[in-house]
A protein has these predicted regions:
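Glycine-rich, low-complexity intrinsically disordered segments
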Residues: 1-108
Length: 108
């Protein structure tokens, strides 16, 4: 897994308040460099085809990606994460708390 940073426009930095208390975040983004799509894909590390909706392929009909990332830190308008699977400069559409383990569980 890759560590990386998500840079938020400075005018949205205030909206990050409290994010640092979380263990993980969900990032919704746009596959802006993906061209076209196929309903059947062969995912990396697999030998067989499957339907696009049964995969994490970036070549999707709607070009929307969603990743759950481990939150490392928040400093100003920079979010440091682990598990990054986006290209540099990928447009981030939204950031939400990961509530799969319970709503607003504290880091511990």
């Amino acid at each position: 897994d890759i560590k990386g940073e998500i840079e938020i426009y400075p005018e949205f930095a205030e909206g990050l308040e409290g994010l640092e208390k979380l263990d993980a975040i969900v990032v919704v983004f746009n596959f802006d460099r993906s061209e076209g799509f196929s309903m059947k894909v062969t995912p990396p590390h697999r030998d067989t085809e499957c339907g696009v909706f049964a995969s994490r392929s970036p070549r999707r009909p709607n070009a929307i990606g969603v990743s759950t990332l481990k939150l490392l830190s928040v400093e100003g308008n920079i979010i440091r994460v682990h598990g990054l699977d986006m290209l540099d400069g990928t447009p981030v559409l939204d950031i939400k708390p990961d509530i799969s383990g319970g709503f607003f569980e504290k880091k511990g």
